Design a protein with these regions (language model features):
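Intrinsically disordered, low-complexity linker/loop segments enriched in Gly/Pro
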Residues: 1-98, 104
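Short peripheral tails and domain-boundary helices/loops at the edges of structured domains
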Residues: 3-6, 123-152
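A hydrophobic, small-residue-rich beta->alpha segment in the mid-to-C-terminal subdomain
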Residues: 157-200
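General structural feature for long, well-ordered alpha-helical segments within catalytic domains
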Residues: 93-99, 140, 195-200
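Short, Lys/Arg- and Gly-enriched loop/turn segments at beta-strand edges
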Residues: 111-121
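Active-site lining segments that contact anionic ligands and/or coordinate catalytic metals
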Residues: 102, 137-141, 170-171
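Glycine-centered flexibility sites
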Residues: 89-90, 100, 117, 124-126
């Protein structure tokens, strides 16, 4: 990486402007919210069990970090899979959630439990193919503040995202400027026809 550009040894001479953003960002759910997710997603699975409509908790594949004993077993049996975004945020994969963005998350537990991860150098909208991003390591710098009773005050149950005003330009072009001076050197006042001729 060099600034906002990256290159690859596999494609020499090509630089690519990225839009660095977290694929995953959100607050912790409370136990009631977690139980609601597991219930409604299991109900969806039950409508067509072989279609892969959702993924229930899976104790066999759960990564529980440093948890041990009963706490580990309970979390593995109840923990929501992180693929879908939910009311708390989660795996949102919004490519425009980059420098200058604002996010408003509902908070369900004391301390919010804000977490950020799955950093992408760039991706398409939604990372819909599960491999549509350029993954990266990095640090995230952000300012966090609390809107006291914000969920009740603004009636929100889901995150609100205000995307970054910074978007890379992937078109490669040059611009020819035309001015209001004709071929003989005569000056005109804001003459678009003369300016157009000079640009062409």
């Amino acid at each position: 990486f060099k600034g906002m550009f990256t290159s690859s040894r596999h494609i020499p001479g090509v630089n690519f402007a990225g839009l660095i953003h977290p694929g995953l960002i959100g607050c912790l759910p409370d136990p009631k919210m977690l139980a609601l997710w597991n219930e409604r997603e299991q109900n969806l699975i039950d409508t067509n069990p072989t279609a892969g409509l959702a993924n229930p908790p899976s104790a066999g594949t759960a990564h529980m970090g440093r948890l041990k004993g009963e706490a580990k077993a309970k979390a593995a049996a109840e923990g929501a899979r992180t693929v879908p975004p939910r009311e708390h945020g989660g795996n949102c994969d919004i490519k425009d959630l980059s420098r200058g963005s604002k996010v408003f998350f509902p908070v369900y537990v004391d301390g919010a439990g804000l977490s950020v991860g799955d950093l992408h150098f760039s991706q398409g909208d939604g990372e819909i193919t599960f491999c549509g991003a350029i993954e990266m390591a990095g640090w995230v710098h952000m300012k966090v503040s609390i809107i006291k009773d914000g969920m009740a005050k603004y009636g929100i149950k889901n995150p609100i995202f205000k995307p970054s005003p910074i978007t890379p330009q992937y078109n490669d072009y040059i611009i020819f400027e035309g001015i209001s001076v004709d071929e003989a050197g005569k000056q005109y006042y804001l003459d678009v026809n003369v300016a157009y001729r000079q640009a062409c």
